[in-house]
Amino acid sequence: MRVLASAPAKIILFGEHSVVYGKPAIAAAIDLRTYVKAEFNENGRIRIEAKDIRTPGLTVSFSEDQIYFETDYGKAAEVLSYVREAINLVMEEAEKQKGVTVSITSQIPVGAGLGSSAAVAVATIGAVSRLFGLELTPEEVAKLGHKVELLVQGASSGIDPTVSAIGGFLYYQKGSFESLPVVELPIVVGYTGSSGSTKELVAKVRKNYEEMPEIIDPILNSMGRLVEKAREVILAEYDKEIKFKRLGTLMNINHGLLDALGVSTKSLSDLVYASREAGALGAKITGAGGGGCMYALAPEKQSEVATAIKIAGGMPIVTKISREGLRIEDIVQ
């Protein structure tokens, strides 16, 4: 038996950093996917093949605590811990231990802040659980994905695996999630080609908050109110043009507030301003900042904005919101 599953990447639409201080955030799944094929093998080991994950690939197998590297190339190795923990958790759920081979291909750049780790964990859980005969709901997959992140990272809000498992728009605050109606946003993601350390950037904001609470607290409060306004706009019965304009304005304000927190970089700002000049209604950082990605809302201007991002030194990815989260693509008996 062979199962092929896929799970999407995500962007933080509004509310990164302020979410750490109990404010809400809105995230969305986007139409870039990681694909995981799972099948049983005869040697009793877990074997992982990652041949195309937007970095050079690797093949590795392990048994108990021993890892057998057949190739090892850079950041591709980061998928190992997420995949292994995902498989182990599914085996615990199924109360079975068998040799499994998983093959991974992905459209999601690793280390870009687009939730590549969560997507590979969710797709692995989806494929391997079906292989073992489990029928998990998207919510159950999301919970297992959150467990994987806790095991590997030590801390996780659960936003990334929840968005990847369920898809669409997700409103998050203090551990609770609410699905929002999907607005078909024509977006362009711009990748700087570098990534900042989320841990270091969060610590930087925390330091400024502790040293100057009277300055930083109003910024965080404004970001929280901005997310509530964005939720209002998403839920409102506006026509598409008005909705896009209002969301674009909120994106621009949110970027300015993130810049005030000190988490932007020149390369990110170059992509943001190039996008706006090319006709985007809004453009902002998505994720922790310090590198990674921005995104632009560009109705009828995606091609022009993508070109502007490329000229400004970024890697443009023209995409859209994914209504679907985890998807079982194929089952071969």
Curated annotation (Swiss-Prot):
Keywords: ATP-binding, Cytoplasm, Isoprene biosynthesis, Kinase, Lipid biosynthesis, Lipid metabolism, Magnesium, Nucleotide-binding, Transferase. Its cofactor is Mg(2+). The active site is at residue 160. PROSITE patterns: GHMP_KINASES_ATP. Gene3D superfamilies: 3.30.230.10, GHMP kinase, C-terminal domain (3.30.70.890). It is found in: Cytoplasm. InterPro entries: GHMP_kinase_C_dom, GHMP_kinase_C_sf, GHMP_kinase_N_dom, GHMP_knse_ATP-bd_CS, Mev_gal_kin, Mevalonate_kinase_arc, Ribosomal_Su5_D2-typ_SF, Ribsml_uS5_D2-typ_fold_subgr. Pathway: Isoprenoid biosynthesis; isopentenyl diphosphate biosynthesis via mevalonate pathway; isopentenyl diphosphate from (R)-mevalonate: step 1/3. It holds the Pfam family GHMP_kinases_C. NCBIfam families: mevalon_kin, PRK03926.1. Homodimer. This is Mevalonate kinase. The lineage of its organism: Archaea, Methanobacteriati, Methanobacteriota, Thermococci, Thermococcales. The gene is mvk.
